[in-house]
Amino acid sequence: MNDNLNVIVGNNECGKSTLLEAVHLALSGQLNGRPLVVEMHPYLFNLDLVRKYIDSLAAGEKPHPPHILLEVYLADDPNLTKLKGDHNSLKIDRPGVSLSIELNPSHAEDFIQYVSDPAEIRTVPIEYYRIVWRNFAGNDIAHSRDIPLHASLIDASTLKNNAAASRYVVDIVKESLSAQEKVDLALTYRLMKDRFLEQPKVKTINDALALKKGKISEKTISVSLDTSARASWEAGVMPHLDDIPLTLVGKGEQNAVKIKLAMETSAKSHIILIEEAENHLSYASLNELIGHISANAGTRQIFITTHSSFVLNKLGVESVLLFQRGSGVRLSDLANTSTQDYFMKLPGHDTLRLILAKRSILVEGPSDELIVQRGYQKKHGKMPLEDGVDVISVNSLAFKRFLEIAVLLKTETDVVTDNDGSVAGLLAKYANYLTSDVVKIRYDTDETAKTLEPQLVKKNGLTTINAVLGKTFTDEASAIEYMVKNKADVALRFFETTVDWSVPDYIADAIR
């Protein structure tokens, strides 16, 4: 990871949030704001692995019980010496922390009895499990204070109701107060409650209630404000923005304030983990927030998850960890340094599209994009993006740069390209990808139909071309000449027409 800023980019369900939660859990011992011991449940375990375990039991095998292991490897810093050792899965001498959820040996016999009938098992019986929290020196960790660094997890979007949002901000404000300020605020709040009883109208009400003594109770009844410990100032104080309760301002403003406050009061934190800072924010507001995060990062290590190409551009592609299918890679992992430089300079939108797509189709320009989009819709009854397939228009000179990322991410990618009158040249250009399991080069071998337009004429014939374009060309050559000179308009006509037409075979292969 980078020492300062790390932007984690990936599709939904790829594990971005899990990564942040795992780091925070290993360093704090807390999940969802509470100790792990009270937040343990069977669904913390990977469902596929649990199913595999149950299937193995059903097959008569004796697999090792499912377990969870989190390891956080830290920099070899003198301040972390007491965490240093080789008690980790890599067996390297480094500072670090491990947290495991594993079968408790004292319950091993009960566990074996429980799993003796695999047909009755659906989830992991966590009642037989224990939590083991240790540093790499092999010493048990009793409390997060035993770890000389602190992590703050900021996910304002999880606060769905007003009460939770208010408590969240009050807790942050409380952290920023000195001990004396907390005492002063608590005392002032109690005095304010005491003055409630001095109000004339309250006295009148209590005098009337006192007359009911003996009718309802033998004791005198009165009304007052709760001054018990449960009614502390934290429960009664509501944060305001310009005299409006925080819970009543816009969601975007709420989230921005929560993130900023958390960063301000996390000055002692060494690691800050921010979940999707862009939630509910406009372009301008997001710009201001990202600027604030960058300016206030200091020497702290920051992790931000995002789907936003703007965040990618603002914070820099060099900070990005491309996360997919539970693993992450960086652009610095690319073997070709010129490709690294290219994507460092390129606006992040197209890069993000390639990262987030389940499958991508790279085309040479807007005309090809329209034809591929419409061809896909005609075949599947919906647009490519509805299937997680992104059609990306790329300068032909940049094709191979995008393919390097596709191979790095193992993202299935089709290249729809012209043969430009030289199949041999095309094969030489993509020689490294012709046998790839990830990348497929789609082209036509007919060198006389070297671009999209003659390919459309070749596939559909002059009659269909005239019907689509609303023209009366008498020969294919004049039709092709017109189509080449009016690429965008022609592609749009093909996209919008109700006339039945077919895509060239090499495009059909890509929209399978």
Regions found by a protein language model. Name each.
Residues 42-59, 336-356:
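Surface-exposed acidic, glycine/proline-enriched linker/cap segments
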Residues 99, 171-257, 261-271, 295:
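Extended helical coiled-coil dimerization/tether regions that scaffold
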Residues 66-70, 92-97, 126-129, 149-150, ...:
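Short glycine-/polar-rich loops that comprise or flank the Walker A/P-loop
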Residues 69, 75-203:
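Electropositive, glycine-dotted interaction segments
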Residues 22-91:
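Conserved P-loop NTP-binding catalytic core
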Residues 350-361, 369-512:
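Acidic, Mg2+-coordinating catalytic modules of nucleic-acid enzymes
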Residues 61-65, 89-92, 124, 263-267, ...:
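Conserved catalytic network of the ASCE P-loop NTPase/AAA+ motor domain
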Residues 1-28, 232-353, 369-370, 374-380, ...:
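Switch/communication elements of ASCE P-loop NTPase nucleotide-binding domains
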